[in-house]
């Protein structure tokens, strides 16, 4: 018997309610203004760094990807880096600028191609927000014309690297506890779930099978904490319908005729996606129903585009 669950808050409203008490605890008695002086922007020939009293984040000037995240209290490195990198689309950095704004350190990256802009904002309390605007123009400019997305979209979003060896588990709010595919979402229910890391390969694992499988796509993210003895962090969704991809499941080595049982996963290790692929069963995807088919993107002048907004807590 499956008990259905339904969300009663949009992701951005839920996030607002979650952050208010945390920010109040971080700055009691109106001490926010005092902390603001500790937030600043630093530049070298190759890097732009956003620094607060709690967290320091450095970006490459060449492509606006994260090169390092440091927790200032203990100097610990959080190895989420080498992103955001486009998945299912193309984007090329056109302009990069940094500034102070209302006490926050802000980095604004503008792109040609499928992405319009990604704005990073580091608040004095150490929370880092990412606001991405995607697919809001019919022409990507700079020779892209409209050829800046995959013809058939399997995965669409942004991806980062994070070493699998650092992760011991995940606690998250969203659909769970099982991983999903585009045509395997019903049955995964909203809730707060916990999974310890495992590398279960159904049909092949010789050791004890541990379920739910840890790696894969997770639907309707509200927040997730990647647990680690050395480098934990939490990410919150401020946009609805985001899929969280966690690492890449291994294919069974003894699969029939060596054929892959799963569609290709995005590059990187941790991805935030607006679309994911279906998984086939006996028949090719082209012979499955409409909910299994790859996405097709059509953009018209005046479209608002898609938003992929996140908040990272590295403290």
Where are the model-predicted features located?
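Short beta-strand elements
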Residues: 1-29
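Beta-strand/loop-rich accessory regions of lumenal/periplasmic or secreted enzymes
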Residues: 20-315
């Amino acid at each position: 018997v499956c008990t259905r669950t339904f969300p009663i808050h949009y992701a951005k409203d839920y996030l607002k309610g979650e952050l208010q008490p945390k920010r109040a605890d971080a700055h009691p008695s109106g001490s926010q203004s005092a902390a603001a002086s500790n937030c600043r922007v630093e530049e070298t020939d190759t890097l732009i760094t956003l620094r607060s009293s709690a967290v320091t984040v450095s970006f490459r000037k060449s492509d606006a990807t994260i090169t390092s995240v440091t927790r200032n209290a203990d100097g610990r490195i959080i190895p989420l880096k080498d992103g955001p990198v486009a998945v299912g689309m193309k984007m090329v950095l056109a302009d990069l600028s940094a500034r102070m704004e209302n006490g926050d350190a802000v980095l604004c990256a503008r792109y040609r191609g499928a992405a319009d802009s990604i704005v990073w904002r580091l608040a004095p309390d150490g929370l880092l927000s990412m606001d991405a605007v995607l697919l809001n123009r019919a022409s990507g400019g700079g020779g892209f014309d409209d050829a800046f997305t995959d013809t058939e979209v399997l995965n669409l979003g942004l991806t980062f690297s994070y070493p699998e060896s650092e992760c011991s588990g995940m606690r998250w709010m969203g659909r769970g506890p099982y991983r999903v595919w585009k045509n395997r979402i019903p049955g995964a229910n909203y809730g707060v779930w916990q999974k310890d890391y495992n590398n279960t390969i159904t049909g092949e694992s010789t050791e004890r099978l541990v379920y739910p499988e840890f790696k894969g796509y997770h639907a309707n993210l509200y927040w997730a904490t990647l647990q680690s003895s050395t480098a934990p962090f939490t990410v919150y969704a401020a946009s609805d319908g985001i899929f969280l991809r966690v690492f890449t499941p291994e294919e069974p080595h003894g699969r029939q005729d060596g054929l892959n049982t799963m569609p290709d996963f995005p590059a990187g290790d941790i991805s935030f996606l607006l679309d994911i692929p279906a998984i086939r069963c006996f028949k090719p995807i082209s012979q499955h129903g409409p909910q299994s088919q790859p996405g097709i993107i059509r953009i018209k002048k005046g479209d608002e585009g898609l938003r992929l907004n996140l908040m990272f807590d590295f403290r």
